[in-house]
Amino acid sequence: GKNIRGEEVYYIGYKPVAKITPKYFDQLPSSFKDIYNNLHNGWVYFASKANGLLPIEDTIVLSDEDWGILEEIDITSLPFKLHNSIGLFDNGMGDYASIDIKSKDEKEGFIWWHTKAPKLNIEIWAVIDEWTKIGIER
């Protein structure tokens, strides 16, 4: 397709997931499992392998990464634990649209910024839609 400047942009949509999935896969909200199982194993901008819902094997558990921002924020005050938090959408700049797999609200998520405190209480699919749109248009 073409972006608003008329330039060609390419996204990759991966085949639905195979049987091998991360141990947290069954704890994902049903909307994500439906996408991964029945439509795509994520979609990303071809050149960067980002700006899209990550293939399930490329999603991250936030506690598995080194985050400099942890020196600046009080993680004990956050309404989630990093080891229960999954980064599902990489914006290509080190930030993730993320969910808490222990949350009872399947529509809620947060943005995990690598340079500032997370933005809480977002509607996860609205952010994924907007970030995908931004990626395609630029």
Give a label for each model feature.
Residues 1-95:
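A surface-exposed partner-binding patch
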